[in-house]
Protein backbone atom coordinates (compact mmCIF):
# COMPACT_ATOMS: atom_id res chain seq x y z
CA UNK A 1 0.00 0.00 0.00
CA UNK A 2 1.31 3.46 -0.86
CA UNK A 3 -0.19 6.90 -0.20
CA UNK A 4 0.13 8.88 -3.43
CA UNK A 5 -0.11 12.27 -1.67
CA UNK A 6 2.61 11.54 0.89
CA UNK A 7 4.85 14.40 -0.25
CA UNK A 8 2.06 16.92 -0.91
CA UNK A 9 2.97 18.89 2.24
CA UNK A 10 6.68 19.38 2.83
CA UNK A 11 6.16 20.05 6.55
CA UNK A 12 4.43 16.69 7.00
CA UNK A 13 7.23 14.81 5.22
CA UNK A 14 9.91 16.51 7.33
CA UNK A 15 7.98 15.85 10.56
CA UNK A 16 7.42 12.20 9.62
CA UNK A 17 11.09 11.63 8.74
CA UNK A 18 12.40 13.32 11.89
CA UNK A 19 10.07 11.20 14.02
CA UNK A 20 11.15 7.98 12.29
CA UNK A 21 14.80 8.90 12.90
CA UNK A 22 14.14 9.93 16.52
CA UNK A 23 12.49 6.59 17.29
CA UNK A 24 15.29 4.64 15.63
CA UNK A 25 13.02 3.14 12.99
CA UNK A 26 15.04 4.30 10.01
CA UNK A 27 16.50 0.82 9.54
CA UNK A 28 13.09 -0.22 8.15
CA UNK A 29 12.99 0.38 4.36
CA UNK A 30 9.95 2.13 2.93
CA UNK A 31 8.60 3.37 -0.40
CA UNK A 32 6.38 6.26 -1.45
CA UNK A 33 4.75 7.94 -4.45
CA UNK A 34 5.47 11.58 -5.23
CA UNK A 35 4.99 14.40 -7.68
CA UNK A 36 8.17 15.74 -9.24
CA UNK A 37 7.60 19.25 -7.95
CA UNK A 38 6.80 18.38 -4.32
CA UNK A 39 10.31 17.27 -3.28
CA UNK A 40 13.79 18.74 -3.56
CA UNK A 41 17.35 17.66 -2.78
CA UNK A 42 17.25 18.46 1.00
CA UNK A 43 13.91 16.66 1.44
CA UNK A 44 15.20 13.65 -0.51
CA UNK A 45 18.31 13.52 1.69
CA UNK A 46 16.14 13.56 4.82
CA UNK A 47 13.86 10.85 3.41
CA UNK A 48 16.86 8.65 2.66
CA UNK A 49 18.15 9.15 6.20
CA UNK A 50 14.72 8.08 7.45
CA UNK A 51 14.93 4.82 5.49
CA UNK A 52 13.29 5.60 2.14
CA UNK A 53 14.75 3.25 -0.47
CA UNK A 54 12.51 3.86 -3.47
CA UNK A 55 9.90 6.29 -4.70
CA UNK A 56 7.64 6.44 -7.72
CA UNK A 57 7.18 9.45 -9.97
CA UNK A 58 4.25 9.41 -12.38
CA UNK A 59 5.65 10.75 -15.65
CA UNK A 60 3.04 9.26 -18.01
CA UNK A 61 4.24 10.68 -21.34
CA UNK A 62 7.01 12.53 -23.11
CA UNK A 63 4.63 13.73 -25.83
CA UNK A 64 3.22 17.23 -25.48
CA UNK A 65 0.23 16.16 -27.56
CA UNK A 66 -0.50 13.23 -25.26
CA UNK A 67 0.02 15.32 -22.13
CA UNK A 68 -2.57 17.77 -23.45
CA UNK A 69 -4.96 14.87 -24.10
CA UNK A 70 -4.68 13.63 -20.49
CA UNK A 71 -4.55 17.21 -19.16
CA UNK A 72 -1.19 16.86 -17.47
CA UNK A 73 1.88 19.08 -17.44
CA UNK A 74 5.43 17.77 -17.05
CA UNK A 75 8.45 20.07 -16.85
CA UNK A 76 11.21 18.10 -18.59
CA UNK A 77 13.92 20.12 -16.90
CA UNK A 78 12.53 19.33 -13.45
CA UNK A 79 12.12 15.67 -14.43
CA UNK A 80 15.78 15.06 -15.27
CA UNK A 81 17.00 17.13 -12.32
CA UNK A 82 14.77 15.26 -9.89
CA UNK A 83 15.72 11.83 -11.20
CA UNK A 84 19.42 12.68 -10.82
CA UNK A 85 18.87 14.12 -7.32
CA UNK A 86 16.86 11.10 -6.20
CA UNK A 87 19.41 8.58 -7.46
CA UNK A 88 22.32 10.56 -5.99
CA UNK A 89 20.76 10.25 -2.52
CA UNK A 90 20.67 6.47 -2.82
CA UNK A 91 16.92 6.34 -3.46
CA UNK A 92 15.89 4.34 -6.53
CA UNK A 93 13.38 6.37 -8.58
CA UNK A 94 10.65 4.29 -10.21
CA UNK A 95 9.42 6.22 -13.25
CA UNK A 96 5.96 5.37 -14.53
CA UNK A 97 5.27 5.87 -18.26
CA UNK A 98 2.10 5.10 -20.22
CA UNK A 99 2.02 4.30 -23.94
CA UNK A 100 -0.89 3.55 -26.27
CA UNK A 101 -3.50 6.23 -25.57
CA UNK A 102 -6.23 6.17 -28.26
CA UNK A 103 -5.05 9.29 -30.17
CA UNK A 104 -1.34 8.44 -30.05
CA UNK A 105 0.70 8.16 -33.21
CA UNK A 106 4.20 6.75 -33.59
CA UNK A 107 5.86 10.08 -32.84
CA UNK A 108 4.01 10.37 -29.52
CA UNK A 109 5.20 6.97 -28.37
CA UNK A 110 8.69 7.76 -29.66
CA UNK A 111 8.76 10.90 -27.50
CA UNK A 112 7.85 8.86 -24.42
CA UNK A 113 10.38 6.09 -25.04
CA UNK A 114 13.07 8.67 -25.78
CA UNK A 115 12.33 10.30 -22.43
CA UNK A 116 12.59 6.91 -20.74
CA UNK A 117 16.00 6.33 -22.35
CA UNK A 118 17.22 9.73 -21.22
CA UNK A 119 16.24 8.96 -17.62
CA UNK A 120 18.14 5.68 -17.95
CA UNK A 121 21.23 7.59 -19.07
CA UNK A 122 21.11 9.63 -15.86
CA UNK A 123 21.77 6.56 -13.74
CA UNK A 124 20.11 4.13 -11.38
CA UNK A 125 16.36 4.23 -12.06
CA UNK A 126 13.57 1.69 -12.38
CA UNK A 127 11.39 2.30 -15.46
CA UNK A 128 7.80 1.09 -15.42
CA UNK A 129 5.93 1.17 -18.73
CA UNK A 130 2.21 0.49 -18.81
CA UNK A 131 -0.73 0.57 -21.20
CA UNK A 132 -3.69 2.87 -20.45
CA UNK A 133 -6.26 1.48 -18.03
CA UNK A 134 -9.97 2.25 -18.17
CA UNK A 135 -11.09 3.16 -14.66
CA UNK A 136 -14.78 3.97 -13.93
CA UNK A 137 -15.47 7.65 -13.38
CA UNK A 138 -12.68 8.90 -15.63
CA UNK A 139 -13.00 10.77 -18.92
CA UNK A 140 -11.11 7.95 -20.61
CA UNK A 141 -13.77 5.50 -19.42
CA UNK A 142 -16.68 7.67 -20.53
CA UNK A 143 -15.23 8.32 -23.98
CA UNK A 144 -13.79 4.92 -24.85
CA UNK A 145 -15.50 2.12 -22.91
CA UNK A 146 -17.59 1.20 -25.96
CA UNK A 147 -14.48 0.68 -28.12
CA UNK A 148 -12.55 -1.31 -25.51
CA UNK A 149 -11.37 -4.83 -26.39
CA UNK A 150 -9.65 -7.70 -24.57
CA UNK A 151 -6.25 -8.57 -26.01
CA UNK A 152 -3.54 -8.44 -23.34
CA UNK A 153 -3.44 -8.31 -19.57
CA UNK A 154 -2.05 -5.03 -18.26
CA UNK A 155 -0.79 -4.11 -14.79
CA UNK A 156 -4.26 -3.50 -13.32
CA UNK A 157 -5.63 -6.77 -14.73
CA UNK A 158 -3.41 -8.96 -12.58
CA UNK A 159 -4.22 -10.58 -9.25
CA UNK A 160 -7.13 -12.94 -10.00
CA UNK A 161 -5.10 -15.95 -11.15
CA UNK A 162 -6.41 -18.59 -8.73
CA UNK A 163 -6.25 -21.69 -10.95
CA UNK A 164 -2.60 -22.68 -11.29
CA UNK A 165 -1.59 -19.20 -12.42
CA UNK A 166 -4.70 -18.79 -14.58
CA UNK A 167 -8.09 -17.22 -13.99
CA UNK A 168 -11.08 -19.38 -13.20
CA UNK A 169 -13.43 -19.89 -16.13
CA UNK A 170 -16.22 -18.35 -14.07
CA UNK A 171 -14.12 -15.21 -13.50
CA UNK A 172 -13.37 -14.96 -17.22
CA UNK A 173 -17.09 -15.25 -17.97
CA UNK A 174 -17.92 -12.38 -15.60
CA UNK A 175 -15.18 -10.15 -17.04
CA UNK A 176 -16.45 -10.80 -20.56
CA UNK A 177 -20.08 -10.22 -19.60
CA UNK A 178 -19.63 -6.94 -17.71
CA UNK A 179 -16.95 -4.77 -19.37
CA UNK A 180 -18.17 -1.62 -17.60
CA UNK A 181 -17.58 -3.26 -14.21
CA UNK A 182 -14.32 -5.01 -15.12
CA UNK A 183 -13.00 -2.26 -17.38
CA UNK A 184 -9.43 -2.57 -16.06
CA UNK A 185 -9.22 -5.94 -17.86
CA UNK A 186 -9.86 -4.26 -21.22
CA UNK A 187 -7.58 -2.49 -23.68
CA UNK A 188 -7.84 0.56 -25.88
CA UNK A 189 -6.80 0.19 -29.53
CA UNK A 190 -4.13 2.64 -30.63
CA UNK A 191 -3.41 3.59 -34.27
CA UNK A 192 0.37 3.60 -33.77
CA UNK A 193 0.91 -0.07 -32.90
CA UNK A 194 -1.06 -3.23 -32.26
CA UNK A 195 -1.93 -4.05 -28.66
CA UNK A 196 0.39 -7.05 -28.84
CA UNK A 197 3.28 -4.81 -29.90
CA UNK A 198 2.47 -2.26 -27.21
CA UNK A 199 2.44 -5.04 -24.63
CA UNK A 200 5.89 -6.19 -25.77
CA UNK A 201 7.17 -2.64 -25.40
CA UNK A 202 5.66 -2.34 -21.92
CA UNK A 203 7.03 -5.71 -20.85
CA UNK A 204 10.57 -5.60 -22.20
CA UNK A 205 11.65 -2.08 -23.15
CA UNK A 206 12.56 -1.34 -19.48
CA UNK A 207 15.45 -3.80 -19.87
CA UNK A 208 16.96 -1.63 -22.59
CA UNK A 209 16.43 1.48 -20.45
CA UNK A 210 18.36 -0.15 -17.61
CA UNK A 211 21.17 -1.82 -19.59
CA UNK A 212 21.74 0.00 -22.91
CA UNK A 213 20.01 3.41 -22.86
CA UNK A 214 22.93 5.27 -24.44
CA UNK A 215 23.59 2.83 -27.26
CA UNK A 216 19.92 2.33 -28.10
CA UNK A 217 19.25 6.05 -28.32
CA UNK A 218 22.30 6.52 -30.55
CA UNK A 219 21.23 3.58 -32.72
CA UNK A 220 17.82 5.15 -33.27
CA UNK A 221 19.49 8.42 -34.27
CA UNK A 222 21.95 6.72 -36.63
CA UNK A 223 19.29 4.60 -38.34
CA UNK A 224 16.63 7.35 -38.33
CA UNK A 225 14.18 4.80 -36.91
CA UNK A 226 11.34 5.24 -34.44
CA UNK A 227 12.49 3.82 -31.11
CA UNK A 228 9.52 1.45 -30.87
CA UNK A 229 10.08 0.20 -34.43
CA UNK A 230 13.75 -0.41 -33.67
CA UNK A 231 12.91 -2.27 -30.47
CA UNK A 232 10.38 -4.51 -32.24
CA UNK A 233 13.04 -5.21 -34.90
CA UNK A 234 15.42 -6.20 -32.09
CA UNK A 235 12.87 -8.64 -30.62
CA UNK A 236 12.20 -10.19 -34.03
CA UNK A 237 15.93 -10.42 -34.79
CA UNK A 238 16.47 -12.17 -31.46
CA UNK A 239 13.55 -14.53 -32.04
CA UNK A 240 15.01 -15.53 -35.41
CA UNK A 241 18.52 -15.96 -34.04
CA UNK A 242 17.48 -18.10 -31.07
CA UNK A 243 14.53 -19.78 -32.84
CA UNK A 244 12.50 -19.30 -29.69
CA UNK A 245 8.78 -19.04 -29.07
CA UNK A 246 7.12 -16.97 -27.76
CA UNK A 247 8.77 -13.58 -28.19
CA UNK A 248 10.53 -12.60 -24.98
CA UNK A 249 13.62 -10.80 -23.72
CA UNK A 250 15.89 -11.51 -20.76
CA UNK A 251 18.82 -9.59 -19.25
CA UNK A 252 21.11 -12.35 -20.53
CA UNK A 253 19.74 -11.88 -24.07
CA UNK A 254 20.62 -8.19 -23.91
CA UNK A 255 24.16 -8.82 -22.70
CA UNK A 256 24.93 -11.65 -25.14
CA UNK A 257 23.27 -10.43 -28.34
CA UNK A 258 22.49 -6.72 -28.32
CA UNK A 259 26.01 -5.88 -29.52
CA UNK A 260 25.61 -8.12 -32.58
CA UNK A 261 22.23 -6.58 -33.39
CA UNK A 262 23.71 -3.09 -33.08
CA UNK A 263 26.60 -3.93 -35.40
CA UNK A 264 24.27 -5.44 -38.00
CA UNK A 265 21.93 -2.46 -37.96
CA UNK A 266 24.82 0.02 -38.20
CA UNK A 267 26.24 -1.88 -41.17
CA UNK A 268 23.12 -0.94 -43.15
CA UNK A 269 23.62 2.80 -42.56
CA UNK A 270 25.15 4.40 -45.65
CA UNK A 271 26.40 7.54 -43.94
CA UNK A 272 27.52 7.13 -40.33
CA UNK A 273 27.35 10.39 -38.39
CA UNK A 274 28.45 9.18 -34.96
CA UNK A 275 31.59 7.01 -35.18
CA UNK A 276 31.74 6.77 -31.39
CA UNK A 277 28.69 4.46 -31.10
CA UNK A 278 30.84 1.35 -30.67
CA UNK A 279 32.79 3.01 -27.84
CA UNK A 280 29.51 3.71 -26.04
CA UNK A 281 28.35 0.13 -26.64
CA UNK A 282 31.62 -1.19 -25.21
CA UNK A 283 31.29 1.13 -22.20
CA UNK A 284 27.82 -0.23 -21.42
CA UNK A 285 28.97 -3.83 -22.03
CA UNK A 286 31.86 -3.47 -19.57
CA UNK A 287 29.60 -1.79 -17.02
CA UNK A 288 27.39 -4.88 -17.12
CA UNK A 289 30.33 -7.28 -17.11
CA UNK A 290 31.91 -5.93 -13.93
CA UNK A 291 28.46 -5.84 -12.32
CA UNK A 292 28.26 -9.63 -12.57
CA UNK A 293 30.93 -9.97 -9.89
CA UNK A 294 30.84 -7.92 -6.70
CA UNK A 295 33.51 -9.30 -4.34
CA UNK A 296 34.02 -7.51 -1.03
CA UNK A 297 36.87 -5.02 -0.96
CA UNK A 298 39.90 -6.55 0.75
CA UNK A 299 42.01 -4.75 3.34
CA UNK A 300 45.21 -3.66 1.61
CA UNK A 301 48.45 -2.91 3.45
CA UNK A 302 52.10 -2.73 2.45
CA UNK A 303 54.95 -3.82 4.71
CA UNK A 304 57.20 -0.78 4.39
CA UNK A 305 60.05 -2.72 6.06
CA UNK A 306 60.27 -4.95 2.99
CA UNK A 307 58.83 -2.63 0.40
CA UNK A 308 61.13 -3.56 -2.47
CA UNK A 309 60.04 -7.20 -2.25
CA UNK A 310 56.33 -6.42 -2.05
CA UNK A 311 54.26 -8.16 -4.73
CA UNK A 312 50.87 -6.90 -5.91
CA UNK A 313 48.38 -8.45 -8.29
CA UNK A 314 45.69 -6.68 -10.25
CA UNK A 315 42.16 -7.43 -9.09
CA UNK A 316 40.68 -9.65 -11.81
CA UNK A 317 37.28 -8.05 -11.21
CA UNK A 318 38.63 -4.69 -12.40
CA UNK A 319 38.67 -4.19 -16.16
CA UNK A 320 40.91 -1.78 -18.10
CA UNK A 321 39.89 -0.57 -21.54
CA UNK A 322 41.27 1.94 -24.02
CA UNK A 323 38.65 3.85 -26.02
CA UNK A 324 39.09 5.81 -29.23
CA UNK A 325 37.01 8.75 -27.95
CA UNK A 326 36.75 10.67 -24.70
CA UNK A 327 33.82 8.61 -23.43
CA UNK A 328 33.40 10.42 -20.06
CA UNK A 329 32.94 13.74 -21.89
CA UNK A 330 30.44 12.19 -24.31
CA UNK A 331 28.43 10.71 -21.43
CA UNK A 332 28.41 14.05 -19.61
CA UNK A 333 26.95 15.58 -22.77
CA UNK A 334 24.32 12.82 -22.94
CA UNK A 335 23.27 13.51 -19.36
CA UNK A 336 22.84 17.17 -20.30
CA UNK A 337 20.69 16.17 -23.28
CA UNK A 338 23.33 16.80 -25.95
CA UNK A 339 23.67 14.05 -28.56
CA UNK A 340 25.99 15.72 -31.02
CA UNK A 341 27.25 13.98 -34.12
CA UNK A 342 30.97 14.62 -34.05
CA UNK A 343 33.71 14.38 -31.45
CA UNK A 344 37.42 14.53 -32.14
CA UNK A 345 39.08 11.13 -31.61
CA UNK A 346 40.95 11.06 -28.30
CA UNK A 347 42.42 7.93 -26.75
CA UNK A 348 41.00 7.46 -23.25
CA UNK A 349 41.89 4.82 -20.66
CA UNK A 350 39.13 3.76 -18.27
CA UNK A 351 39.12 1.39 -15.34
CA UNK A 352 35.85 -0.37 -14.40
CA UNK A 353 35.02 -1.95 -11.06
CA UNK A 354 31.84 -2.82 -9.18
CA UNK A 355 31.70 -2.40 -5.41
CA UNK A 356 28.47 -3.67 -3.88
CA UNK A 357 25.74 -1.85 -5.85
CA UNK A 358 27.97 0.98 -7.07
CA UNK A 359 29.71 1.03 -10.45
CA UNK A 360 33.08 2.76 -10.35
CA UNK A 361 34.55 4.06 -13.61
CA UNK A 362 37.74 6.10 -13.36
CA UNK A 363 39.98 7.59 -16.01
CA UNK A 364 43.63 6.61 -15.73
CA UNK A 365 46.86 7.61 -17.47
CA UNK A 366 49.36 5.46 -19.34
CA UNK A 367 51.60 5.14 -16.27
CA UNK A 368 48.75 3.65 -14.20
CA UNK A 369 47.81 1.32 -17.06
CA UNK A 370 51.35 -0.02 -17.36
CA UNK A 371 51.78 -0.25 -13.58
CA UNK A 372 48.61 -2.34 -13.28
CA UNK A 373 49.68 -4.54 -16.19
CA UNK A 374 53.01 -5.30 -14.50
CA UNK A 375 51.38 -6.17 -11.18
CA UNK A 376 51.09 -9.85 -12.10
CA UNK A 377 51.37 -11.43 -8.66
CA UNK A 378 54.98 -12.51 -9.33
CA UNK A 379 57.08 -9.40 -9.98
CA UNK A 380 58.28 -7.53 -6.87
CA UNK A 381 57.60 -3.82 -6.75
CA UNK A 382 61.29 -3.01 -7.20
CA UNK A 383 61.30 -4.86 -10.55
CA UNK A 384 58.07 -3.15 -11.61
CA UNK A 385 59.57 0.25 -10.80
CA UNK A 386 62.77 -0.54 -12.71
CA UNK A 387 60.84 -1.57 -15.81
CA UNK A 388 58.74 1.61 -15.78
CA UNK A 389 61.58 3.99 -14.98
CA UNK A 390 62.91 4.32 -18.52
CA UNK A 391 59.58 5.58 -19.85
CA UNK A 392 58.16 7.54 -16.93
CA UNK A 393 61.00 8.46 -14.58
CA UNK A 394 63.46 10.40 -16.73
CA UNK A 395 63.20 13.59 -14.63
CA UNK A 396 63.42 11.75 -11.28
CA UNK A 397 66.01 9.81 -9.35
CA UNK A 398 65.39 6.08 -9.19
CA UNK A 399 64.63 6.41 -5.46
CA UNK A 400 62.08 9.18 -6.02
CA UNK A 401 60.45 7.24 -8.85
CA UNK A 402 60.29 4.09 -6.72
CA UNK A 403 58.59 6.09 -3.97
CA UNK A 404 56.02 7.38 -6.47
CA UNK A 405 55.32 3.78 -7.54
CA UNK A 406 54.81 2.80 -3.91
CA UNK A 407 52.36 5.66 -3.46
CA UNK A 408 50.46 4.68 -6.62
CA UNK A 409 50.25 1.03 -5.50
CA UNK A 410 48.93 2.10 -2.09
CA UNK A 411 46.20 4.22 -3.68
CA UNK A 412 45.20 1.54 -6.19
CA UNK A 413 45.16 -1.07 -3.43
CA UNK A 414 42.95 0.98 -1.13
CA UNK A 415 40.54 1.58 -4.02
CA UNK A 416 40.32 -2.16 -4.68
CA UNK A 417 42.13 -2.28 -8.03
CA UNK A 418 45.12 -4.19 -6.62
CA UNK A 419 45.36 -7.06 -4.18
CA UNK A 420 48.28 -8.17 -2.07
CA UNK A 421 50.28 -10.98 -3.63
CA UNK A 422 53.24 -12.79 -2.12
CA UNK A 423 56.41 -11.15 -0.85
CA UNK A 424 60.01 -11.83 -1.82
CA UNK A 425 62.16 -11.35 1.25
CA UNK A 426 65.91 -10.82 1.49
CA UNK A 427 66.20 -9.27 -1.96
CA UNK A 428 68.06 -6.22 -0.67
CA UNK A 429 70.50 -8.37 1.28
CA UNK A 430 71.21 -10.65 -1.71
CA UNK A 431 71.93 -7.72 -3.98
Feature names for model-found ranges:
Residues 10, 17, 21-219:
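A structural motif corresponding to the C-terminal lobe/cap of the Radical SAM core domain
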Residues 241-304, 356-431:
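Long, charge-rich, low-complexity alpha-helical segments
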Residues 139, 331-334, 362-363:
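Short conserved micro-motifs at the rims of enzyme active sites and ligand-binding pockets
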Residues 2-6:
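Glycine-rich Rossmann NAD(P)(H)-binding loop
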Residues 214-236, 240-247, 263:
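Rossmann-like AdoMet/SAM-dependent catalytic core
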Residues 302-357:
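Long, low-complexity, charged/polar intrinsically disordered regions in eukaryotic proteins
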Residues 55-57, 351, 381:
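Short beta-strand motif preference
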Residues 35, 132-134, 323-325, 355, ...:
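Residues that form or immediately flank small-molecule/cofactor binding pockets and catalytic motifs
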